[in-house]
Amino acid sequence: MKTKDFRDMTDEELLKEIDGFKTELFNLRFQLATGQLDNPARIREVRKGIARGKTILRERELKINRA
């Protein structure tokens, strides 16, 4: 998911999206541990998605406007 997509979301939607990413990350780590993970790069994508979402929330909290 692109940063622009995150910026278009409301805070509530962002929190739901971050929660969904966290759940997905948990499941991916579980699959990794059991040897059933098909796409290991997805773990990195999900972690970055969580980071992007949290960054946008923090920017809004501090009232920083970014293009």
Curated annotation (Swiss-Prot):
GO terms for MF: structural constituent of ribosome
Species this chain originates from: Desulfitobacterium hafniense (strain Y51)
Tree of life domain: Bacteria
Xref: Pfam families: Ribosomal_L29
InterPro entries linked: Ribosomal_protein_uL29, Ribosomal_uL29, Ribosomal_uL29_sf
HAMAP family for this protein: Ribosomal_uL29 (MF_00374)
Family of the protein in this entry: Belongs to the universal ribosomal protein uL29 family.
GO biological process, any: translation
GO cellular component: cytosolic large ribosomal subunit
UniProtKB keywords: Ribonucleoprotein, Ribosomal protein
Protein name: Large ribosomal subunit protein uL29
Stored PANTHER family: 60S RIBOSOMAL PROTEIN L35/50S RIBOSOMAL PROTEIN L29, LARGE RIBOSOMAL SUBUNIT PROTEIN UL29C
